[in-house]
Amino acid sequence: MKRVATFPFSYGESTDPVTGRRDAILKRPRTDPYVIQTDTSLEYWQFHASLVTHDALGNELTLPDNVRYYLLSSAQHLAVAGAAPNRGMCEQLSNPLTPGVFLRALIVAMDRWITDGTPPPPSEYPRASNGTLVAPDRTSTGFPSIPNVRYGGLVNRLPLRDYGPQFTSQGGIITLVPPQAVPGKEYRVLVPKVDADGNDVAGLRRPDELGAPLGTYTGWNHRQAGFRSADLCGLTGSYIPFARTRAERTASGDPRPSLEERYPIGKNYLDQVTQSAAGYARRRLLLQEDVARIEQAATGRTVP
């Protein structure tokens, strides 16, 4: 994603309501490349990813035919496969969800798009038009009230910034350092809506962690007290495991069903993982070899 916080943010041509300018990332149809862009949930909270698909006021934009865009649901910016969640300076455990299995399938899809003209699967991302892209407050997102989890609805805001007279969206020389926010000029930033467990509804949901969830995975985390606790915790998301039993859940006041309630026998978990993985494979969003790996890993898990 284009990270310089200046218009244009989206691939198709549009008019910016904040500046009145009309522009696009892609504007030379004869030579524009094929594009597959992915963003994690954290990119919505920290890097204004929603502006790829809507304008400054939240009005939905249409992506060009040569662009595909996918949300890697409920993932943080980067997670190391197999690494145990840890808190560091964050309040909650880090998010262990790794969406690499989807990236592998999309690389194959890009290769086919270029070599034989087979288009990739349709884009999958949250949209305001179907209620899956919303304001960051709790009422809008639907994030559950989980014991010992602070939800501030804090998002990295994006005011229009003045970089000095020699800098435009096309580049130039920054003469105003640090750049100054222009009063009364701000871009609306939206985030993915979540389900009753607190996991993103839209996008590509990893079968063994969201198709059959083991906890809540988010694209945001807060810093602990003593580490600027009012702020988001950098590029780290959150992992909030489900209680193992109904008794544990009831004792803590957790509204999310426990593992015991979700998966009375281990086969229930494996069946849900298998069904979810098969659906993605049919849509060419998972490779068969990764389906086998996911199912093998799920078989080895003790749930509940």
Q: Where does each model-flagged region fall?
A:
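C-terminal His-loop and adjacent cap/lid subdomain of alpha/beta-hydrolase
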Residues: 1-304
